[in-house]
């Protein structure tokens, strides 16, 4: 079962990128590998209910149960110990990844207050894109009235692109709203 964005990739993005970068084989064209969502919840060290709410929010947003991340070292100034739960993360692949990106591009990002586009400089040099979201309430799955606290999250989009230019062209072909 192909999602709308996956079908768009095969029908429109692959031919456009083959022409733009001069690829001879469709398998050379960069593609999306995974989308990783990470939510750090520092307050979870003192109140376990906060982490449960964060896990529930991320499960609604991603459509799958996130993994609780634990601290690796004790930090006295943050009042956390080694092994304490301090966040959650999930990795989306295949159909869920395409569905999440479709919702992110077409529904969630336009709902951000004063949104002018995402920065085009957030690539890591190896063709992967990272961005942060300040509020989880931009996603339509989250009920605004049921939210206990506004939490942000990190979104990492991993591609097979070798360079940042290829990755940016790939995401721009998906109608990703870049500012520059």
From Swiss-Prot:
Gene Ontology molecular function: any one: structural constituent of ribosome
Entry's Gene Ontology cellular component terms: ribonucleoprotein complex; ribosome
Keyword Transmembrane helix applies: no
Pfam entry (one): Ribosomal_L5
InterPro entries: Ribosomal_uL5, Ribosomal_uL5_bac-type, Ribosomal_uL5_C, Ribosomal_uL5_CS, Ribosomal_uL5_dom_sf, Ribosomal_uL5_N
Biological process, per Gene Ontology: translation
Keyword line: Ribonucleoprotein, Ribosomal protein, RNA-binding, rRNA-binding, tRNA-binding
Name assigned to this protein: Large ribosomal subunit protein uL5
